[in-house]
Amino acid sequence: CLSFHKFDMRNCFKKDYFTLCLNIFTSIGYFDDEKDNFSVIKSMAQSVKKNCHIVIDFFNVQNVIKNLVSSEKKQIDDVIFFITRYVEDNKIIKQVRIIDNDLEYSYYEKVNLLELNYFKNVFHKLGIELVSLFGNYSFDEYQENSERLILFGKKL
């Protein structure tokens, strides 16, 4: 039976309960404090049973930096989007300004540039074995220029 729950992903929801825990589409790395990013992976490890798996899907830092589009303008109907991206303080920052007729909105997001070695070190500290590493959603082998960094870990 599939069910959905809202909770803080930095805290373990149910300890040693699940056979698989997923963190997909770069939903980690948004916290300013590194301890919080670590806590997310720790809670994932705590939530799965022994010999069960966690999966983390993150963007590949090298690929993002290499292909970074620093600014662009998009228009959908009468709404105009001005998007700016840049790297600062080991984070990728995206600012979006939206103009909808006479209304103007803006927001920004920032994501830590977490590389493969970061995840390997965290896995080691938490007793997670890195079982597989993929570079895209077709599960092709991870390369330095891969689009994604998809890690399959097993709780020991």
PLM regions and their residue ranges:
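C-terminal lobe and adjacent flexible extensions of AdoMet/dcAdoMet transferase-like proteins
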Residues: L116-L156
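A short glycine-rich, Lys/Arg-flanked "PGG" loop and its adjoining helix->strand segment in the class I
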Residues: D36-H53
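SAM-dependent methyltransferase
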Residues: V55-V122
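A short, aliphatic-rich alpha-helical micro-motif
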Residues: K15-D16, I41
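A short SAM/SAH-binding and catalytic strip from SAM-dependent methyltransferases
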Residues: F18-K35
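A short, glycine/Asx- and small/polar-enriched loop/turn
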Residues: D16-T19, I92, E144-L149
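Conserved SAM-binding strand-loop segment of SAM-dependent methyltransferases
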Residues: C1-K14
